[in-house]
């Protein structure tokens, strides 16, 4: 790849993984972040919650309830109509968001170079270790755009695991995946809580049960439930998803 192309790729990468100063973000000494009175048009109204180190939050609700909108506000892609986000001033960088539109998040000419982009301090050994863990090593020299849907998801989660941030955001990370790929991604996402916190918008109750220790249930523009999960809470998850599908 030409040098100018690398520069363009890095500029694009900055959109997803950089410290951008925005007026509704306040820096304090706290946990990962706190959301206060966030409102967005007629989709979200007076959303309040905090995100603590070690949280793996499943963000659930019907289609169109505002899950993706909330993730994009946390990512600073869109600005809320009202409210603010209070961030830990020690946060290493902006949140890392993995969206459903996967191809828009690839900027280089190989799987290996995607892992290195924006992660210059990550060693080659670390890159190879994660590629092998996610069964992407044989594809390391392929174009990311040529991967299957499951392989692209695994690559994006791998990139997230090597990033310098401490807040990871995932929008339907198991959409269209088979059980084996879901298990691989679940295992890696569970490891991310050691670096900070994870928020996952999902319609997959089994994936939520395998990965999350907390549920935020959005309904009618607000938070209906914010619940800590225990190992034995599979019945509670089932009840919430039954309510969602009514």
Predicted regions and their residues:
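Conserved beta-strand-loop-alpha-helix hinge in the C-terminal portion
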Residues: 1-12, 222-245
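Catalytic Walker B motif of ABC-type/P-loop ATPase nucleotide-binding domains
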Residues: 168-172
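Conserved ABC ATPase signature
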Residues: 143-147, 151
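ABC-family nucleotide-binding domains
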Residues: 178
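The feature captures the beta-strand-to-loop junction immediately N-terminal to the Walker
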Residues: 60-62
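Helix-to-loop junction immediately C-terminal to a conserved catalytic motif
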Residues: 75
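ABC ATPase C-loop
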Residues: 160-161
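Conserved ABC ATPase "signature" region
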Residues: 124-139
């Amino acid at each position: 790849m030409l040098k100018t192309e690398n520069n363009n790729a890095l500029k694009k990468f900055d959109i997803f993984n950089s410290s951008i100063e925005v007026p509704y973000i306040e820096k304090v000494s706290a946990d990962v972040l706190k959301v206060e009175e966030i409102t967005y048009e007629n989709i979200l109204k007076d959303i309040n919650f905090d995100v603590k180190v070690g949280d793996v939050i499943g963000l659930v609700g019907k289609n169109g309830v505002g899950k993706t909108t909330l993730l994009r506000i946390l990512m600073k892609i869109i600005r809320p109509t009202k409210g603010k986000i209070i961030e830990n001033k020690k946060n290493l960088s902006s949140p890392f968001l993995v969206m459903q539109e996967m191809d828009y998040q690839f900027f280089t000419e190989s799987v290996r170079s995607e892992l290195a982009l924006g992660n210059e301090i990550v060693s080659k050994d670390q890159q190879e270790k994660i590629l092998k863990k996610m069964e992407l090593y044989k594809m390391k020299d392929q174009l990311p755009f040529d991967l299957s849907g499951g392989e692209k998801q695994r690559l994006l989660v791998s990139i997230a695991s090597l990033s310098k941030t401490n807040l990871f955001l995932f929008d339907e990370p198991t959409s269209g995946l088979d059980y084996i790929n879901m298990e691989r991604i679940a295992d890696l996402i569970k490891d991310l809580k050691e670096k900070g916190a994870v928020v996952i918008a999902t319609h997959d109750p089994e994936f939520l049960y395998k990965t999350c220790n907390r549920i935020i249930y959005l309904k009618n523009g607000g938070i209906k439930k914010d619940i800590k999960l225990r190992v034995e809470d599979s019945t509670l998850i089932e009840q919430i998803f039954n309510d969602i599908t009514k």
